[in-house]
């Protein structure tokens, strides 16, 4: 439920691009840069939050993240300057999402189940976040239609505070995890040094950059893009919602089959599939049917990357510092998110079209497939077992 709310609130921000820019007389690059800051803030604070969760427990981190999240949404409702926009929806919401989302919650879920059920748990957690995208985006659109965008943000800010209560059940499964692989004592700095010298880990970080580029660009700009080509604003909201719905199944299936299939090959397939889907979407004339099909296919591949990616981190280094090390991987994801969101707005303002960003997404998908291919699916030498299935 916590992941549902955290991811759901954030997924609705693309709906505010047009009303916020029109109300303040800004170009789309302004709010795009704010959303880019949000993604970068999320990435930086994800690594920090992961380290704090490993040290002090997930509950305290989630409560802190909830406060930042609610404050950022509330301040966005009264935004009348660029610096306030960047501070609210950018810095504060980004920090809030970092403390209430995958990087903090998924490691706690992994520790709560036996080793042979870890990938299943990762799939369930990722699917829960996707359910939030499916459920919350139409609700946000309805709130905007009924009360206006300012009141809608106020309602969301108050609702976000409820996430703090949902963190309490995580208490037994957060903080220090038993280093079940071999009882090797390692501090967080040593874990970071070990990871940064690991070639497969660095390839994983670079590939996850592409996932962030795709996801953030489409989430932030799809509603405005569809409106520009002649669709009703409701179509944009439902497109993002369909992505969330199909991702529930994609993420769950990805988590379930990651126990049986090669995680690196699964990731190669996902990224190539995205490139094919985007290419066909841009080449075939736009219609309601093509929007629905594209949204469904992209949704199925959307966060299907998370179970095998986080699973590879657990295989390589174990679960002791998984929140922190996955946070570093996620920082790569958010650097991609920053690039996708900001570049989308910048190119639109300078060229009047999103086409170049779509085709860049195709090229990056191919790049991601290539860098995942040589990843080694085995543990570091200090772990007792040569291969830990998770």
Q: Model regions: which residues?
A:
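C-terminal transmembrane helical hairpin of 12-TM major facilitator-type secondary transporters
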Residues: 217, 243-247, 253, 258-312
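Intracellular juxtamembrane helix-capping segments at the cytosolic ends
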Residues: 20, 99-113, 304-317
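Conserved MFS/SLC helix-loop-helix module at the cytosolic interface between two early adjacent transmembrane helices
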Residues: 44-83
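Flexible cytoplasmic inter-helical loops of multi-pass small-molecule transporters
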Residues: 169-190, 381-388
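Helix-loop-helix hairpin linking two adjacent transmembrane segments in secondary transporters
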Residues: 125-175
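Cytoplasmic helix-loop-helix junction between adjacent transmembrane helices
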Residues: 89-127
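Extracytoplasmic gate region of multi-pass secondary transporters
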Residues: 13-17, 198-252
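Hydrophobic core of transmembrane alpha-helices in multi-pass small-molecule transporters
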Residues: 72, 84-100, 209, 290-304
């Amino acid at each position: 439920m916590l992941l549902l709310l955290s991811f759901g609130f954030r997924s609705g921000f693309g709906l505010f691009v047009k009303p916020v820019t029109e109300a303040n007389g800004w170009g789309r690059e302004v709010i795009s840069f704010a959303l880019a800051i949000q993604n970068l803030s999320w990435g930086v604070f994800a690594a920090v939050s992961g380290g704090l969760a490993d040290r002090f427990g997930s509950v305290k981190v989630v409560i802190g993240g909830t406060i930042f999240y609610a404050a950022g949404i509330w301040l966005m409702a009264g935004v009348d300057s660029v610096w306030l926009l960047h501070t609210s929806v950018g810095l504060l919401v980004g920090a809030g999402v970092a403390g209430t989302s995958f990087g903090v919650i998924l490691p706690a879920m992994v520790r709560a189940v036996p080793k042979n059920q870890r990938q299943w748990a990762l799939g369930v957690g990722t699917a829960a976040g996707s359910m939030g995208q499916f459920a919350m985006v139409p609700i946000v659109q309805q709130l905007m239609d009924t009360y206006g965008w300012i009141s809608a943000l106020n309602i969301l800010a108050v609702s976000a505070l409820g996430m703090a209560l949902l963190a309490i059940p995580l208490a037994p499964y957060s903080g220090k995890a038993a280093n079940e692989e071999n009882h090797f004592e390692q501090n967080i700095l040593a874990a970071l040094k070990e990871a940064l010298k690991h070639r497969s880990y660095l390839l994983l970080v670079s590939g996850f950059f592409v996932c962030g580029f795709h996801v953030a660009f489409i989430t932030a700009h799809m509603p405005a893009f569809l409106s520009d080509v002649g669709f009703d604003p409701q179509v944009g909201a439902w497109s993002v919602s369909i992505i969330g719905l199909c991702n529930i199944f994609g993420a769950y299936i990805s988590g379930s089959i990651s126990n049986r299939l090669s995680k690196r090959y699964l990731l190669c397939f996902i990224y190539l599939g995205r490139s094919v889907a985007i290419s066909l979407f841009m080449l075939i004339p736009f219609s309601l049917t093509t929007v629905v099909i594209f949204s469904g296919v992209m949704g199925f591949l959307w966060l299907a990357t998370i179970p095998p990616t986080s699973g590879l981190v657990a295989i390589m280094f174990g679960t002791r510092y998984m929140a922190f090390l996955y946070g570093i991987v996620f920082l790569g994801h958010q650097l991609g998110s920053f690039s996708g969101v900001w570049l989308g707005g910048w190119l639109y303002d300078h060229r009047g079209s999103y086409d170049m960003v779509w085709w860049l997404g195709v090229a990056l998908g191919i790049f991601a497939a290539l860098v995942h291919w040589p990843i080694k699916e085995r543990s570091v030498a200090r772990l007792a077992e040569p291969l830990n299935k998770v």
